[in-house]
A protein has these predicted regions:
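Short, charged/polar N-terminal "headpieces" of proteins
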Residues: 1-23
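A short, structured beta-strand/loop element
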Residues: 18-43
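Aromatic side chains
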Residues: 12, 32-33, 55
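Acidic, low-complexity intrinsically disordered segments
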Residues: 3-6, 46-85
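Generic alpha-helical secondary structure signal
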Residues: 10, 16, 36-37, 59, ...
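Generic structural motif recognizing short loop/turn segments at the entrances and edges of beta-strands
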Residues: 2, 17-19, 28-30, 74-78
């Protein structure tokens, strides 16, 4: 069984326009990102909404997709976009 631990979000990365999702996966540090576009389009956030807050409000769904992708072998640096939800 895969050992996956989520630790919340790691803040907003303005250069990537995404919220960092730090993950411990089988002892390795993995970084996924959730795009601002996904937060706006798929989770109904207002354009001026705090990306971290929108992430927190939808954390369960985000973690479910991240878990699926980890099991499929998608590694460090994966960006979750609106199409992933």
């Amino acid at each position: 069984m895969l050992d996956i631990e989520f630790s919340g979000h790691g803040g907003y990365d303005a250069a990537r326009e995404a919220v960092l999702l730090p993950i411990q996966f089988d002892g390795a540090d993995i970084r996924y990102y959730v795009s601002r576009d996904a937060l706006l389009r798929k989770f109904g956030a207002a354009a001026d909404a705090d990306p971290g807050k929108v992430f927190d409000e939808n954390r369960l769904q985000i973690e479910m997709i991240a878990t699926l992708y980890l099991r499929q072998g998608k590694g460090d640096g994966t960006v979750l976009t609106a199409d992933d939800f």
